[in-house]
Design a protein with these regions (language model features):
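Flexible, solvent-exposed loop/hinge segments and secondary-structure transition points
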Residues: 1-137
Length: 137
């Protein structure tokens, strides 16, 4: 029997809150997605002004980070033409803004943001994780 750690809805709310606060601080309304360790959506928020075209992008970033347990920007260099994993895109995202969420040595989910630049998306994702870590337990 497996003992699986995963994010719950309260955790997702904290991740979104932290990401939203940073997005407000930098003046960029975001789409924010949180998934469990298998990449299944737990919660999503489109801030007022978040781009409609960023809804699925944020969800794909979160999926990649949670299910693959790897930050989306780390896939970028590996997925260029000529490299062995070029073409794996489907739901996987290679654009910065998706980060795995770790509790100790367990990946418990992922957070993905979209609507800003990749650097802005990554900063907001990290702010969400930092807020969650500071307000959990």
């Amino acid at each position: 029997m497996l003992d699986i750690k995963r994010l719950g809805i309260d955790d997702a709310a904290k991740l979104i809150e932290g990401a939203r606060r940073h997005a407000n601080d930098i003046g960029v309304p975001m789409c924010i997605a949180v998934v469990d360790e298998s990449g299944n959506l737990i919660a999503f928020e489109r801030m007022d002004g978040g781009k409609a075209s960023s809804i699925s992008v944020a969800q794909n970033k979160a999926y990649t980070a949670g299910a693959a347990r790897k930050a989306t920007h780390e896939y970028n260099a590996a997925c260029v033409p000529g490299n062995l994993v070029f073409g794996i895109h489907t739901e996987l995202s290679v654009v910065g803004g998706g980060l795995p969420v770790w509790a100790g040595d367990a990946c418990v989910g992922g957070i993905g943001l979209s609507s800003g630049t990749p650097d802005q998306d990554m900063a907001c994702a990290q702010a969400g994780i930092d807020y969650w870590a500071a307000h959990s337990q």
